[in-house]
């Protein structure tokens, strides 16, 4: 396994969770506080605290991660959806393990953030 932390909730979910999608190095799980009818989190197995540190992934792994985000949305039947990453406490990040929010199943307004 890639470097993980025993005290990290998301590291634990990558090892043992109710995955809606899985690929080598990445998992997707349902968000426990959904903001849309479909709201999943895409989590890399490797513990990287925030998007600021995305450079810890090499180019191939970064590409695979983005492809997995798109593949997860496809597998969930989403044609239109939102992908978000919260960076740091001021950006709304509460779990310090890089993850992508994939939200769909409803229309998002232009002025909405």
Name each model feature, range by range.
Residues 1-113:
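HIT superfamily nucleotide-processing domains
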């Amino acid at each position: 396994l890639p470097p993980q932390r025993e005290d990290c909730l998301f590291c634990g979910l990558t090892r043992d969770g109710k995955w809606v999608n899985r690929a080598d190095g990445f998992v997707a799980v349902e968000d426990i506080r959904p903001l849309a009818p479909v709201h999943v989190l895409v989590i890399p197995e490797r513990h990287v605290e925030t998007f600021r540190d995305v450079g810890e992934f090499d180019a191939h792994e970064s590409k695979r991660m983005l492809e997995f985000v798109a593949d997860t949305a496809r597998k969930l039947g989403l044609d239109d959806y939102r992908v978000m990453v919260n960076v740091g406490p001021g950006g709304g990040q509460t779990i310090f393990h890089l993850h992508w929010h994939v939200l769909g199943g409803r229309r998002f307004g232009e002025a909405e953030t």
